[in-house]
């Protein structure tokens, strides 16, 4: 479970990721947000549901101690940045593959239950959940470049955005 931040903009960060990340990261985003929203481990905003209608299982608090989940749970700005990034990932998935990601409905549900935060979402910092030897290595960002620019707005962002 990780958040791949290649740019302070959640949209530009999503666009620059390779296909593999575009496919799998929306699910990891939903898993982190389900902990943030949970009564037991997060802020009690409510349950998030999978596409099949079942709630994400949070009883055991899986991933609650992961650095990225802790970061997302720390403040609303972080939570909303992650949510905006998740929506951008789903948008990018639709642009690249021509179909809707199975996590999109969950991300839209999160928009409706998480309290608002000032836009633009600007976390004070991001967390790093990799080996220390790569902590300050920015060369990886050079590998992730978007093949073509697209409109920076997200059609599914809340109206306050």
Where are these regions (language model features)?
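An N-terminal structural lobe/cap that precedes and organizes the functional/catalytic core
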Residues: 1-94
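Charge-rich, acidic-biased intrinsically disordered regions
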Residues: 51-55, 59-61, 102-124
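Charge-dense polyanion-binding interfaces
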Residues: 80-114
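Acidic, Ser/Thr/Gly/Pro-rich intrinsically disordered interaction regions
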Residues: 123-131, 138
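Conserved small/polar residues in nucleotide/adenosyl-binding loops
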Residues: 144-149
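Ala/Thr-enriched low-complexity intrinsically disordered regions
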Residues: 152-153
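Hydrophobic alpha-helical segments, chiefly the membrane-spanning helices
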Residues: 156-161
